[in-house]
UniProtKB/Swiss-Prot annotation:
Composition bias, Basic and acidic residues: 7-35
Record flagged with keyword rRNA processing: yes
Protein name per its UniProtKB record: Ribosome biogenesis protein NSA2
Upper taxonomic lineage: Eukaryota, Fungi, Dikarya, Ascomycota, Saccharomycotina
Motif (Nuclear localization signal 2): 51-58
Pfam families registered for this protein in UniProt: Ribosomal_S8e (PF01201)
Region span, Disordered: 1-35, 61-84
Matches recorded under CDD domains: NSA2
Function (record text): Involved in the biogenesis of the 60S ribosomal subunit. May play a part in the quality control of pre-60S particles.
Keywords on record: Nucleus, Ribonucleoprotein, Ribosome biogenesis, rRNA processing
Signal peptide positions on this chain: none
Organism name: Vanderwaltozyma polyspora (strain ATCC 22028 / DSM 70294 / BCRC 21397 / CBS 2163 / NBRC 10782 / NRRL Y-8283 / UCD 57-17) (Kluyveromyces polysporus)
Length: 261
């Protein structure tokens, strides 16, 4: 073994500390706080260099995410006749242009327009002011900073939701006010079912509230209706369907909605 690998040799012979994994996990969890602290405290040339390094890291990450998203859509094969070679017989009927992106974008557009096709039970709702929606949270050692806000209404955050680091989290969605399921009533069948919420489609108050997943009266939500056994005209099982919230969830403590059929 090379002389400079004495640490690896010691690990192989004696193993690691019993709390090594826990210490490693905590060190990685503290990393975001350390980066935040350095970004706030470093000034002058060091601050500029640190900001430049962080910027390049973020750009690289965005490029990596974009490349990963594009790799999911298979690219069209380049025509072989440009190089002068003849196309084989089994490739003559293949399309050279890639239509996957066009199809996926048209499907997304149709999904966006779906909510507008229905005549909703509540066409008009009462407007909610920002003072009613958000509560100012005082932070800092002497509680003088007031840039944080806490949502006072019920919200939906989804399955894989992870909170941002505390120092960077501007809007807080309390765990006690998060909803995962709704009491959905089918208007034609006259039955009420307790169904899981898939997403918040549109909040009539503001696009920002839609993005935050705020559940207020008149909000269009997508629910999982696979339990109802609904099928399309083509015989396929319907997975998600839109519903409109008809009550005030923050007053009742639950979400009641009417299915849009």
């Amino acid at each position: 073994m090379p002389q400079n690998e004495y640490i690896e040799q010691h690990i192989k012979q004696h193993g690691r500390r019993l709390d090594h994994e826990e210490r490693k996990r905590k060190r990685e969890a503290r990393e975001a706080h350390k980066i935040s602290e350095r970004a706030q405290k470093l000034t002058g040339w060091k601050g500029k260099q640190f900001a430049k390094k962080r910027y390049s890291e973020k750009v690289a990450m965005r490029k990596k995410i974009k490349a990963h998203e594009q790799s999911k859509v298979k690219g069209g094969s380049k025509p072989l006749d440009e190089s002068g070679d003849a196309l084989p017989t089994y490739l003559l009927d293949r399309e050279q242009t890639n239509t996957a992106k066009a199809i996926s974008s048209s499907i997304k557009q149709k999904r966006l327009e779906k909510a507008d096709k229905f005549s909703v039970p509540l066409p008009k709702v009462r407007g909610i002011s920002e003072e009613e929606m958000f509560k100012v949270v005082k932070t800092g050692k002497s509680k003088t900073k007031s840039w944080k806000r806490m949502i006072t209404k019920h919200t939906f955050v989804g399955e894989g939701f992870t909170r941002r680091p505390v120092k960077m989290e501007r809007i807080i969605r309390p765990s006690a006010l998060r909803q995962k399921k709704a009491n959905v009533t089918h208007p034609e069948l006259g039955v009420t079912v307790f169904l899981p919420i898939l997403s918040v489609k549109k909040n009539p108050q503001s696009p920002m509230y839609t993005q935050l997943g705020v559940l207020t009266k008149g909000t269009i939500i997508e629910v999982n209706v696979s339990e109802l056994g609904m099928v399309t005209s083509g015989g396929k099982v319907v997975w998600g369907k839109y519903a409109q919230i008809t009550n005030e969830p923050d007053r009742d403590g639950c979400v009641n909605a009417v299915l849009l059929v």
